[in-house]
Design a protein with these regions (language model features):
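Mature catalytic core of soluble alpha/beta enzymes
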Residues: 1-195
Length: 195
């Protein structure tokens, strides 16, 4: 029961809440890095709930961040970030619920109104550009929801760097992202490179 009137949304359901946190973290990244730059800070790593954006370098070296494994403790890979780049991940492993042993993501598929399925985790890297933080956050969700159709959507969104773990634990990586990843152990045997 959500009513939209112009730019205003309302409901009679007292329990209804709309949470924009999933997209506003990326906007907050852009805002935080702008404030840091305005204050003369040229080197920083900003992490807002798993969304990361970097400025400059770490003691002359690129910033290196880990990409969390969706089913095991610790990172599955690391990636070096250059000045102004941002990383965003959507997954079913931090906010979820289980019913009869089946995991349901907190990310809803707007086509069905049900939790998105078929993807355990999806990470995007956005190269330095205006609103890189917002795009890293905003792009990871629809690509997560798109499931196996993510390559077509990534092309339409102009997102070149993508890593996806599907619902069965198979890894898919865009060619551009493959060149940026360093696997913690060895590359997984079920890795598919998507052109």
């Amino acid at each position: 029961d959500l009513r939209l009137t112009g730019l205003q949304a309302s409901s009679r359901q007292r329990a209804l809440a709309i949470d924009f946190g999933g997209y506003l973290k990326g906007v907050a990244l852009d805002r935080a890095t702008s404030i840091l730059l305005a204050q003369g800070v040229g080197n920083a790593l900003v992490n807002i709930g798993g969304n990361v954006m970097v400025l400059g370098s770490r003691n002359g070296q690129r910033w290196r961040v880990g990409i969390q494994h969706p089913r095991q403790p610790g990172p599955m890979a690391t990636i070096e970030l250059e000045d102004g780049e941002a990383v965003g991940t959507s997954g079913d492993y931090q906010r979820y619920f289980e019913v009869d042993g089946r995991r349901y993501s907190h990310v809803l598929d707007p086509r069905s109104g049900r939790p998105a399925s078929g993807t355990q985790a999806l990470t995007v890297l956005i190269t330095a550009r205006p609103a890189a933080g917002a795009l890293s956050d905003a792009a990871s969700k629809p690509l997560f929801i798109a499931g196996s159709e993510w390559p077509d959507l990534a092309r339409r969104l102009h997102v070149q760097h993508v890593l996806r773990i599907d619902g069965d634990g198979h890894w898919q990586v865009s060619k551009a992202m493959q060149g940026r990843l360093e696997f913690v152990a060895r590359p997984p045997p079920s890795l598919t490179v998507v052109p």
